[in-house]
Amino acid sequence: MSNNDFLVLKNITKAFGKAVVIDNLDLTIKRGTMVTLLGPSGCGKTTVLRLVAGLENPTSGQIFIDGEDVTKSSIQNRDICIVFQSYALFPHMSIGDNVGYGLKMQGIGKEERAQRVKEALELVDLAGFEDRFVDQISGGQQQRVALARALVLKPKVLLFDEPLSNLDANLRRSMREKIRELQQRLGITSLYVTHDQTEAFAVSDEVIVMNKGKIMQKAPAKELYLRPNSLFLANFMGESSIFDGKLENGVADINGYSVPLKDAAQFNLPDGECLVGIRPEAIYLAAEGSDAQRCEIKSAVYMGQPLGKWLQTGRGKDLLVNCKPEGF
């Protein structure tokens, strides 16, 4: 491990009875970065977070935080905080007491506690909310209180367990921007779990896609989307239309239609049978053109920006294309 490797999981396996849910997983998160675990339901992402937190014990393998082996350490001794989906706030306590609860358990004096609570609430744009109660604030504000409660402890590692799932679309967008801003400003090493790809892309330095207890690919969002390393990733990361083709000298032939692959040489793609994935935004509709494939519109769905249209090629394959709403 290098000095910059802050959170490290080595050869982690987790089994419940005979069911192996995490299969010999290796994971490294650099100091001060945020990494998101993304994947289909049941892929093991939440189990990984629980293992890091100390809420579950691995069947085998080791977990290191800042160079220290914490595999057998309790959650209290890992210097970790978790922001939950459910907020987990105490309704009988004021906002200030909720945020300061962990400090009180650590024996921090009243005066210092009040100052740190004040600073934490200012960080999440809730200055002056100390004396309010949970039922007096909105869901988005409650999630910011939960975030302040974690930040006030200044943990080595901050964990997020699908924290925005209970919020509406606009609140999710503003909260993910706030989470990313604070994580970068404070430099807290963070592990984030979500099923929302947009959310994962927005908050992360790197995204890890999991499936069946294994890491399928770890990369920045742009690389994951544009250069998936498998058919599973191509289908999972956004919409794709997948065609059988044959590659020769950087050009894929799809049933007689030629598609130049500009990255073929860079990645030393061999000639021969291949699968070609085409993103909806890479296709343009036109009445005619020299480089066009004749298609028939099967259906159109208005989604605001953009509009989705399902086309059928002359060879019977379905193709999804995005276009502007005025073309509806």
Swiss-Prot record:
User: What catalytic activity is recorded?
Assistant: Fe(3+)(out) + ATP + H2O = Fe(3+)(in) + ADP + phosphate + H(+)
Q: How does it sit in the membrane?
A: Peripheral membrane protein
Gene Ontology terms, MF aspect: ABC-type ferric iron transporter activity; ATP binding; ATP hydrolysis activity; transmembrane transporter activity
Give the EC class as a word.
translocase
Q: Which PROSITE patterns match?
A: ABC_TRANSPORTER_1, ABC_TRANSPORTER_2, FBPC
Concerning CDD domains, the annotation shows: ABC_Carb_Solutes_like (cd03259)
- What domain of life is recorded for the organism? Bacteria
Which SUPFAM superfamilies does the UniProt record give? MOP-like, P-loop containing nucleoside triphosphate hydrolases
Protein name listed in UniProt: Fe(3+) ions import ATP-binding protein FbpC 1
Q: Which organism is it from?
A: Haemophilus influenzae (strain ATCC 51907 / DSM 11121 / KW20 / Rd)
